[in-house]
Amino acid sequence: MKVAVDAMGGDFAPQSVIEGVLQARSEFTDLDFILYGDQAQIEPLIDDMTRLTIVHTTEKIASDDEPVRAIRRKKQASMVLAAQAVKDGQADALFSLGNTGALLAAGLFIIGRVKGIDRPGLMPTLPSINSDQGFNMLDVGANAEAKPEHLHQYGLMGNFYAKDVRGIENPRIALLNNGTEATKGDELHKATYQLLADDPDLNFVGNVEANDLLKGVADVVVTDGFTGNATLKAIEGTATIVMSQVKHAIMDAGVKEKIGGLLLRGSVGGIREKFDTSIYGGAVLLGLKAPVIKAHGAADARTVYYTVKQIHAMLANQTVQKVIDYFSDQAAQKNSN
């Protein structure tokens, strides 16, 4: 199994990318890596080239580049070459810490979407206070608008991922809505609710409100990209602010408070670990013909390692192939009827 790596994507590339890949290489001996980027910057970071190949290019896509234009014009960019390798069968998966929009465009226009999937969805794994496994939510920004059929497909794809990668036997699928009752929401959410509820292949548990997301009430939460992106940023922002306020409240206080802070250090550390999303890896662009993973631009080597772990699980369990087979069977059944 081979992974195409955009070694130049991210705030700390290529160092954080290479360090994470080297950690993953030590554990996953059945993975090979093709590193796309500036050879002069990459080589000094590697002592042993076992199962590593460098494809040299100095062109890269910047964080402020217009996504589709960058993919079309920067043909030799590290991200574009990595995506092309997956399309050509030279690699089985792609991951990058670079420009999110550009990676979405590369995945869609170069690698291509699964036949039967109308719109791929971007899906991260988020923390839950009641579980170390967290929960998946999609879409969080690949598509601003959606139809009920799209959200239904997100539920199906998320179901496969939760089973294969997270090891959940019967994932609970929920719909993000403004109330838990079946009649809540606009026409999009009402129609989506019915599609999810009527699907015998899904363990649909109904609507979930945003204030219950972190309580672990579902394993996969389905939403449109606009709502999902806003919700994701609210969760990330809240977690950052809360931990920052706790730290400053202790450090800026008097001696008694600092002593109390020392006594609570273990508990505070546990909370920090609970909201440490690096252990979940990156966000998966589900609905493409191969695994495509986007990790945060500021990700460190630890996050890169867990992202590769994600990819390994998807490849070993043939998650994408299961999605392809499922939607192919669905299309065949429709045609026979």
From Swiss-Prot:
Q: Where in the cell is it found?
A: Cytoplasm
Q: Name the Gene Ontology molecular function terms of this record.
A: phosphate:acyl-[acyl carrier protein] acyltransferase activity
- Quickly give the catalysed reaction: a fatty acyl-[ACP] + phosphate = an acyl phosphate + holo-[ACP]
* Gene Ontology CC: cytoplasm
One Pfam family hit: FA_synthesis
Q: What class of enzyme is it?
A: transferase
**What are the EC numbers?**
2.3.1.274
The UniProt keyword set, sorted, is: Cytoplasm, Lipid biosynthesis, Lipid metabolism, Phospholipid biosynthesis, Phospholipid metabolism, Transferase
Annotated pathway: Lipid metabolism; phospholipid metabolism
Name any Gene Ontology BP term. Answer: phospholipid biosynthetic process
Q: Which InterPro entries match?
A: FA_synthesis, Phospholipid_synth_PlsX-like
Report the sequence similarity comment from the record: Belongs to the PlsX family.
Q: Which PANTHER family match?
A: FATTY ACID/PHOSPHOLIPID SYNTHESIS PROTEIN PLSX, PHOSPHATE ACYLTRANSFERASE
Sum up the protein's function in the record's words: Catalyzes the reversible formation of acyl-phosphate (acyl-PO(4)) from acyl-[acyl-carrier-protein] (acyl-ACP). This enzyme utilizes acyl-ACP as fatty acyl donor, but not acyl-CoA.
Subunit structure, interactors included? Homodimer. Probably interacts with PlsY.
This one is known as: Phosphate acyltransferase
State the species of origin: Latilactobacillus sakei subsp. sakei (strain 23K)
What gene is behind this protein?
plsX
